[in-house]
C-alpha cells in the first residue's frame, strides 16, 4: 500500500479563536465532514481514526458495501457486555437527571430539548469509523448540524454530535454495521486467539473483530488476561500492546 495524496486541513467552518486556543489539530474535528472537498476524485470514503487498526479485512468490505447501499455506514456503540454508557442520576425516587453523552453535548451546543431528548438514549454513533459515498446526502446534513453545534458548543466532539443528530433526528438513511467493524476497547476488551494471531470478541462464538478502536483509552481493570486458550503459556504476551502516548 502507498499514500497517494496528503492534504492540509483547513477551518472549513469558521470558529472563534477563543475556542481554538492555538490547538490547530482541532481542524480534524471539522475537516472529516468535508472529505469530498479535499479528495474529490473518489466514489467512496472510509474514515478510520489513527487509534484504530484493521484486524480483519472483512470490516473494510462491509464499510464499502454499506455506503454503496445507504447514505452512511457506521456502528452503534452498543453490544453484549459493553459498559453502561447511559448515565442517569436519580433522586426523589422517580425523578432523574439525564447525563448521557449525546444529551449533555446537545444542550451545551444550543440544540433545543426536543432534539436533545430524541438522541439522549439513542445508541451513540462513534464517528471514528464510518463510510459514505461521494454523492451521499449525509455530507450536507452533517455539515449543517456541525455548523449549528459549533455556533455555541465546543469544537471537540461536535462532529460526533452532528452525525448522531443527522441520523436520529434528520433520518439519514444509515446502514448500521456489526460492532466488530468498530470495537471500542474502552467498553469491553477483546480476547486474543493465539492460534490464528487475531483479536476476537470476548463472548461466544468469539467472532473476529474487524477494527479494534482505542477510543477513550482502555477499560482499566487489573490483571486482564486476553488469552483465549489459557493452556498456552506466554510470558507477558501483551505488555505494551495497548500503551497510548
What label would you give each PLM region?
Residues 1-245:
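Glycosyltransferase catalytic domains, chiefly GT-A lineage
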Amino acid at each position: 500500500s502507498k499514500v497517494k495524496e496528503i492534504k492540509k486541513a483547513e477551518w472549513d467552518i469558521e470558529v472563534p479563536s477563543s475556542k481554538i486556543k492555538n490547538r490547530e489539530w482541532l481542524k480534524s474535528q471539522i475537516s472529516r465532514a468535508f472529505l469530498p472537498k479535499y479528495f474529490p476524485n473518489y466514489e467512496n470514503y472510509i474514515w478510520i481514526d489513527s487509534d484504530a487498526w484493521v484486524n480483519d479485512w472483512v470490516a473494510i468490505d462491509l464499510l464499502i458495501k454499506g455506503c454503496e447501499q445507504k447514505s452512511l455506514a457506521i456502528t452503534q456503540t452498543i453490544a453484549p457486555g459493553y459498559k453502561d454508557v447511559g448515565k442517569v442520576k436519580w433522586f426523589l425516587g422517580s425523578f432523574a437527571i439525564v447525563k448521557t453523552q449525546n444529551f449533555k453535548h446537545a444542550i451545551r451546543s444550543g440544540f433545543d430539548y426536543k432534539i436533545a431528548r430524541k438522541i439522549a438514549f439513542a445508541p451513540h454513533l462513534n464517528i471514528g469509523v464510518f463510510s459514505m459515498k461521494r454523492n451521499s446526502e449525509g455530507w450536507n446534513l452533517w455539515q449543517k448540524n456541525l455548523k449549528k453545534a459549533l455556533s455555541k458548543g465546543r469544537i471537540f466532539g461536535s462532529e460526533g454530535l452532528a452525525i448522531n443528530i443527522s441520523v436520529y433526528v434528520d433520518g439519514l438513511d444509515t446502514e448500521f454495521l456489526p460492532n466488530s467493524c468498530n470495537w471500542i476497547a474502552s467498553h469491553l476488551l477483546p480476547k486474543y486467539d493465539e492460534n490464528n494471531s487475531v483479536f476476537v470478541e470476548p463472548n461466544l462464538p468469539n467472532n473476529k473483530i474487524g477494527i479494534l478502536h482505542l477510543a477513550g483509552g482502555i477499560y482499566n481493570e487489573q490483571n486482564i488476561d486476553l488469552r483465549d486458550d489459557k493452556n498456552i503459556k506466554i510470558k507477558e504476551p501483551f505488555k505494551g500492546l495497548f500503551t497510548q502516548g
